[in-house]
Amino acid sequence: KRMAIRLPQPKAYENYYEDIALFALPVEDAADEMQAKITCVNLATTGNVKAAQTVNMDAAGVIRSSYPCYIQYEYEQPFTCRNIEIVLNGNNYQAHRLKVMASDDGVNYRLVKQLVPARQGWQNTDENSTHSIPPTTARFFRFYWTPEGSEPGSEDMDAAKWKPNLKIKELRLHREARLNQWEGKAGLVWRVAQATKEEEVGKQDCYSLSQVINLTEQYTSHSNGKTLTATLPKGKWKLLRMGHTATGHTNATAGGGKGLECDKFNPKTVQKQFDNWFAQAFAKTNPEVARRVLKYMHVDSWECGSQNWNKRFAIEFQKRRGYDLMPYLPLLAGIPMESVEQSEKILRDVRTTISELVVDVFYQVLADCAKEYDCQFSAECVAPTMVSDGLLHYQKVDLPMGEFWLNSPTHDKPNDMLDAISGAHIYGKNIIQAEGFTEVRGTWDEYPAMLKALLDRNYALGINRLFYHVYVHNPWLDRQPGMTLDGIGLFFQRNQTWWDKGAKAFSEYATRCQSLLQYGHPVTDIAVFTGEEVPRRSV
């Protein structure tokens, strides 16, 4: 039967949206979700537990708890669940540690799955998280949580280091099969998750290429959406309209430069950002003087989410991977195709292509620009925010750099230093820099002996050039404590009580150490394979 259907435009940011493809996928039944009665039950047994601290749901439906509890979804009729989408208001590691139980009668429960958090970066809030489970039909689903057994705070996962509290905006139970943690695997956000298991998504749940109909050429543009005019085979079909838009993510620490970032896969947009940023120092001054004075161009740690598409991505993918991505595009929405093994492989190829483009386009263009202006190129980490190989971009920079934190275990990520150090060793860079003593919620209690132990550790790891975070210009003579960066960073300026003697002695010590270290060359006795997973880091 020939039909004409108007298709609404998918969600867009920054008034930008462009279509990529339209697919028709056969479905057996409509995937209407059923309403459930939601109950939260506190399981704390200690006598000193305060009522305000037990599990509760606020007026907006956000569930909070600091004590063992469960969340129950009760359906009037048996409901088949294949995946659980976790929606958060912020970064909550504990929400991904739920134990899923199911029951037919509300009395006898069986284990469905213990959810396992993905390894995640500190900007983990850009996307929801979808956990696949074995197909389970039941009237009651319980999600148990306990702070016991929480990871004390592993690398990258800032939220795992915080006091274990549960905070969930919404749990969405879905009938349709989805790949486990597909949001990270599609390159939407920096995550490393377990592969989808066949008992969760079987061969019968995966679309074959022959089942999927590409309708991209059969729908026309309208001012308020798209209209599809097509004839589909008899049966029930789901239309999947796929497009690309801005992430909506803006950099947050750039002061006057706050705003959207350029397309990292397009050399023209990278060049434009450089021309309207760093090159302006030469355009608005005497260029000959600027060349003598301005000798370094620095790109700081990447803090603006990830990117997984642009207009040429499919072309680059085919050139680099040797096959056409377009027929498999539904995978980027988590829809399994061919088999879970094939689906995981193709999405890994997507992430590999992303990581290569970041280096071959963004960092290569900036390296060429720096050379054009007789500057050395300094750069910090791209992980754990942009989907990437955390070491690969250091081949393009002259001066690799990482960062280490002071008295901030919830934010310190030693891999930031290890990425820079290992990357420098691999690509033969003798100067290895560090943004040192970055701090959050500073309490004004730092002193040279405290700083020395931390600095010595990082010298031993492999750095040989220190940048103080933060040493800010303080223009005032009549204000105390003077210029700071609020609670961020070391208080290292002339109003520090030990400045006159301590700062000079400490700086001279650092200068002597790194002067000697820069004369040397690293002797690396062990090579460690970082694996084939993407994203990846030094450890």
Regions inferred by a protein language model and the residue ranges of each:
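Carbohydrate-binding surfaces of carbohydrate-active enzymes
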Residues: 1-51, 65, 73, 81-83, ...
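Active-site "lid/cap" and pocket-lining segments within catalytic core domains
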Residues: 1-47, 147, 151-156, 162-248
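Generic detection of short hydrophobic beta-strand segments and adjacent strand-loop junctions
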Residues: 115, 129-133, 213, 228-230
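Surface-exposed loop and turn segments in beta-propeller and other repeat-based domains
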Residues: 117-121
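Hydrophobic alpha-helical membrane-insertion signals
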Residues: 204-216, 277-280, 293, 300-306
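Catalytic grooves of carbohydrate-active enzymes
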Residues: 243-248, 256-281, 515-518, 522-539
